[in-house]
Amino acid sequence: MTMFNRISLPVLLLVLVLKSAPAASYEVTDKLSFGGILAGAYQYQALGDSLPKFGDTGRGAVPFQFEVSYAPTPSNELFAKFGFAAGNGLNDGTSPFYLAPWAATLEDDVKDINGSNRDYLLTAWYKHIFTFAGEQQLALTGGIIDATDYLDENAYSNDEYTQFMNEALVNGPQGFLPSFDIGGAAEWEFNQFAIKGVAMNVEENDDGNNFNYYGVQFSYVMESGLGEGNYRAIFNITSGDFLNLAGTETERLKSFLLSFDQELGDIFGVWVRFGWANDDAARDWQSLYSGGINIKGSGWQRPDDTIGIGYGFLDGGNMGIDNTQVFETYYRYAVNEFFAASADIQYMKDSMEVGGNTDGWILGVRLTTEF
């Protein structure tokens, strides 16, 4: 099947969803509901003459995720999410950069997930919620889960389908949060405080080793005259199953992240994400310093539109990268409550400890429908 045919079918589905979305019923019953997201993006990289092996070229991809929820009672829920995609965009090796220009779950990501021989089933879990006096709540989840559903959240920098596309501005790349494998999560909320913990067993890492992951997030919601602010601290650690640079021993991965977002009135918002990691194992980056501005379209009578401006600096680890820089800005135009179109511009630069540097621009267009 050609790339055109593999992409044209999801594009046709995108058109059909757009035509039917306003009339769709998402709650089949008061207990059963479904939803999903269908996106299509095309990105073109402009590298100039410095990297003739890669060159100026473009690629597209169309991911589709469908989810179903069954909640027999308000305290119990069964949930499953399936992922399909046509194409890998510039993530297929076309791009010379170490960071993925689009952090979406694309064609290669939904097949043989984590070396498990499982295709398309991203998450499947059961959750039970315990409610206590004094506005306390404890939710326990078990099954196939995604650590990023619980940890390293951010109101303005956490969604590759509606916000920034570059992986450094979606989550902390040095934070190694795993997705789509067996595990459990606990979420405790008390007034403005929350603690979330995740434990997972991941089938296979890049070294081919099975490993355990543990993460915990402490968060606080602050209400002020400026608006709502969310302040989070995240700790991550794995079992010692990651090869060191020499490939002679296995080590643990450890990291610490801070993820803050703060409203500045009705139009503006700001965010930062800082992170640090050990380099006992082979690591591309050891630290991250990123931040940006979110601007709502209320200022020009487009309240559902958004402008995002973000920058990230990643200090290299022990794999030969001195540092990586990424700048990204996007305009998201909301056509209606279901569909939006985004224009996206990225600049990336990988500075190496030895040898030349790689830099260039990536121009993108993204269409997204949520239902």
Task: Give the location of each predicted region.
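Surface-exposed loop and membrane-interface regions of Gram-negative outer-membrane beta-barrel proteins
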Residues: 44-62, 70-124, 135, 207-210, ...
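Transmembrane beta-barrel strands of outer-membrane/channel proteins
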Residues: 36-42, 80-84, 140-144, 197-201, ...
